[in-house]
Amino acid sequence: MNEKKINQDIYYAYGSNLNLRQMARRCPTAELLGTGVIPDYELLFRGREEGKSYLTVRPCPGAQVPVAAFSVQPSDVHELDLYEDVPSGLYRIEPIATEVCGSGRNSCGVLEGFWYVMNDDRRLP
């Protein structure tokens, strides 16, 4: 099998992980690289009426998901995996790439990284 290795140095955050204070607590060595949008995806809440709902993404032609790109260390990825409940199978890591623009002039470029996507077949807690 010839699977492409996922770049786990760049994390694309959406939803609550766009909160910089929250990210700083969860991933103290993460550095904000810039912002962008992932084209042809949309945000989707999944959950139960009486309980929590969880944010995920899914393909949707013409839609866009706003993201922040962070440079992360293995320890940050470990904390994110726990927060996103990867060990139980709620979310999985998927590769993604998009153009990211930072705060400096001419500081835009396409970065390959990863984000978390909810598994469709997973029962919600």
What is the meaning of each model-derived region?
Residues 2-125:
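Glycine-aromatic micro-motifs
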